[in-house]
Design a protein with these regions (language model features):
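Sec-dependent N-terminal signal peptides
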Residues: 4-13
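Zn2+-dependent metallopeptidase catalytic core
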Residues: 23-48
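Active-site-flanking segments in enzyme catalytic domains
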Residues: 42-174
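Extended hydrophobic/Leu-rich segments
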Residues: 9, 23, 27-31, 66-73, ...
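Boundary at the C-terminal end of the N-terminal hydrophobic targeting segment
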Residues: 17-21
């Protein structure tokens, strides 16, 4: 609770500092579309706890990376958490965690855009019928591969061995 209070105070300070900045009509429009930083922070903390409690294979650090990289960019994170917690659609969540893992490798490229992974994707993308939606988009392929790694590791290892090994390397280095 103490940590959350300090975090909330830090967010309030950040909001006050932002209020002193030049407020443009574009900035006002952007703020009106998004919850306040405090609301985001509380939602972010609660959601990460729900993800880790619901799916024990998601480490707190990966859940944190996932929420941080996807929450403000796309609605998939919010929708997939809702689907998993309320409806039990675990594959939607593992797919979104796969996107977060692909975004975690900031060594000149995300994991899914590393030159070696592009070669793996070109070689193996048509090997696995279960990953059909990932054929043409490298980010979708990576997310589908992570989902397969979690739910059907032996199928992925047989059909896409280089992808399987690459996912292991990404997890070890994230």
């Amino acid at each position: 609770m103490k940590r959350l209070t300090l975090l909330t105070l830090a967010c309030i300070f950040f909001i006050n500092v932002q209020a002193r900045a030049e407020i443009t009509p574009q900035l006002m429009q952007e703020w009106s579309r998004q919850p306040s930083n405090v609301q985001w922070d509380l939602y972010y903390q609660r959601t990460n706890i729900q993800v880790v409690d619901t799916l024990p294979w998601v480490s707190p650090s990966l859940a944190d990376t996932w929420a941080y990289t996807t929450m403000n960019v796309q609605n998939g994170y919010v929708q997939s958490v809702d689907m998993v917690i309320k409806r039990g659609y675990e594959s939607a969540l593992t797919h979104e965690v796969g996107h977060a893992l692909s975004n975690a490798g900031y060594t000149p490229y995300w994991w899914c855009y590393q030159p070696c992974f592009i070669q793996i994707w070109q070689a193996e993308r048509y090997n696995n019928v279960m990953m059909a939606q990932g054929f043409d988009d490298i980010r979708e392929y990576f997310a589908c591969a992570y989902d397969m790694y979690i739910r059907y590791p032996q199928v992925l290892k047989r059909a896409n061995p280089m992808t399987y090994n690459y996912i292991i390397v990404c997890l070890q280095n994230t």
